[in-house]
């Protein structure tokens, strides 16, 4: 239920950002009169809709409720980890909102793509806060994925083979595996970006021998 409440609230927030984007693009000239502000809205819209609407509702809400039901299991394999998975999301959203409040916001697009996310374009802590927000959301996703995979593999009714599982359970299972493979790679990319911004490394800076396209591949 908490997942649903959180997801609905985030969905309303995301929808209001969506309306702002549509209003800006739906008529000639500008409505916001500020390109940076528009970019911040687009970035926040992407993050909120993915990490705070789709994942909490589709996976957190429906997944946690339907998967054990369809397996004949009393609960998820790790209920407390499930709880922790949820409670990482509110601080993550708080960090994302604070990233839009400090300096002029993180106007990088939702991929946080360098060089737009470098110190030259965003000198203050806004991009760093957005990266920390992504880290927390990613940890939450990984915990959830481990929980789902363990539940589906180990907590089925006796005689319920994998090929007899409902397609919804299969879809959650495959999504969780893909998430477990991809989320650490994304975490690596944004951590490298974080060190590029704060510790003078040059992972993505060609002037220091880095590869400007590497981030794109990792993402």
From Swiss-Prot:
The record lists Fe(II)-heme a as bound by 45
Membrane topology summary? Multi-pass membrane protein
The protein's Enzyme Commission number: 7.1.1.9
Keyword Acyltransferase set for record: no
Q: Give a yes or no for keyword Thylakoid in this entry.
A: no
Q: What pathway or pathways are given for this protein in its record?
A: Energy metabolism; oxidative phosphorylation
* Residues exposed to the Mitochondrial intermembrane side: 23-46, 107-128, 188-219
Keyword vocabulary terms for this entry: Calcium, Copper, Electron transport, Heme, Iron, Membrane, Metal-binding, Mitochondrion, Mitochondrion inner membrane, Respiratory chain, Translocase, Transmembrane, Transmembrane helix, Transport
Gene Ontology terms: biological process: electron transport coupled proton transport; mitochondrial electron transport, cytochrome c to oxygen
Q: Which GO terms describe its molecular function?
A: cytochrome-c oxidase activity; heme binding; metal ion binding
Quote the subunit structure annotation.
Component of the cytochrome c oxidase (complex IV, CIV), a multisubunit enzyme composed of a catalytic core of 3 subunits and several supernumerary subunits. The complex exists as a monomer or a dimer and forms supercomplexes (SCs) in the inner mitochondrial membrane with ubiquinol-cytochrome c oxidoreductase (cytochrome b-c1 complex, complex III, CIII).
- Family statement: Belongs to the heme-copper respiratory oxidase family.
Q: What does this protein do?
A: Component of the cytochrome c oxidase, the last enzyme in the mitochondrial electron transport chain which drives oxidative phosphorylation. The respiratory chain contains 3 multisubunit complexes succinate dehydrogenase (complex II, CII), ubiquinol-cytochrome c oxidoreductase (cytochrome b-c1 complex, complex III, CIII) and cytochrome c oxidase (complex IV, CIV), that cooperate to transfer electrons derived from NADH and succinate to molecular oxygen, creating an electrochemical gradient over the inner membrane that drives transmembrane transport and the ATP synthase.
Please report the name of this protein according to its UniProt entry. Cytochrome c oxidase subunit 1
The organism named in the record is Acanthosepion pharaonis
């Amino acid at each position: 239920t908490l997942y649903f409440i959180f997801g609905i609230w985030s969905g309303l927030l995301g929808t209001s950002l969506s309306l702002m984007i549509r209003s800006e693009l739906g008529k000639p000239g500008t409505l916001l009169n500020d390109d940076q502000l528009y970019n911040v809205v687009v970035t926040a819209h992407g993050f909120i809709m993915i990490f705070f609407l789709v994942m909490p509702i589709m996976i957190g809400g429906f997944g946690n409720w339907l998967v054990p039901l369809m397996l004949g299991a009393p609960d998820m394999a790790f209920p407390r980890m499930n709880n922790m998975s949820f409670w990482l999301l509110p601080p993550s959203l708080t960090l994302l909102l604070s990233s839009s409040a400090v300096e002029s916001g993180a106007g990088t697009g939702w991929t946080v793509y360098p060089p737009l996310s470098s110190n030259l374009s965003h000198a203050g802590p806004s991009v760093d806060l957005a990266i920390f927000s992504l880290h927390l959301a990613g940890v939450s996703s990984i915990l959830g994925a481990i929980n789902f995979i363990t539940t589906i593999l180990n907590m089925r009714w006796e005689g319920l083979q994998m090929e007899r599982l409902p397609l919804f359970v299969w879809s959650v299972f495959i999504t969780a595996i893909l998430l477990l493979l991809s989320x650490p790679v994304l975490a690596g990319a944004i951590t490298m970006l974080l060190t590029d911004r704060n510790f003078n490394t040059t992972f993505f800076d060609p002037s220091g021998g880095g590869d400007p396209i590497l981030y794109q591949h990792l993402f």
